[in-house]
Amino acid sequence: MARVKRAVNAHKKRRSILKASRGYRGQRSRLYRKAKEQQLHSLNYAYRDRRARKGEFRKLWIARINAAARLNDITYNRLIQGLKAAGVEVDRKNLADIAISDPAAFTALVDVARAALPEDVNAPSGEAA
């Protein structure tokens, strides 16, 4: 069986790893083994954080909606409850955008939600205090 010489392939692979690891700090950008380890970690972090980003944006939208809702004397929880009761299907991303860019429209949505809410949520059903 013929001997396999891997010089070209090995150098090509090392060169591509070192090229991808430019910008890393210290040995991680210069030594192949350190660069390879760092690249594995970097790709894992990128994969994980692409998924985490979705939750972070949702938290941001909720914080913005809550801040705008409290300016209209209603809590985020009651606003969402009222919008669902009124049958308004606006997702949190668009609701946050409306809250920032068009406060008058957001106030109109708050009024719709307030009208759809029952008078006293804490009272037993059928008895308004």
Curated annotation (Swiss-Prot):
GO terms for cellular component: ribonucleoprotein complex; ribosome. GO terms for molecular function: rRNA binding; structural constituent of ribosome. This is Large ribosomal subunit protein bL20. Belongs to the bacterial ribosomal protein bL20 family. CDD domains: Ribosomal_L20. One of its GO terms (biological process) is ribosomal large subunit assembly. Binds directly to 23S ribosomal RNA and is necessary for the in vitro assembly process of the 50S ribosomal subunit. It is not involved in the protein synthesizing functions of that subunit. Keywords: Ribonucleoprotein, Ribosomal protein, RNA-binding, rRNA-binding. HAMAP family: Ribosomal_bL20 (MF_00382). PANTHER family: 39S RIBOSOMAL PROTEIN L20 (PTHR10986). It comes from the Bacteria. The keyword tRNA-binding does not apply.
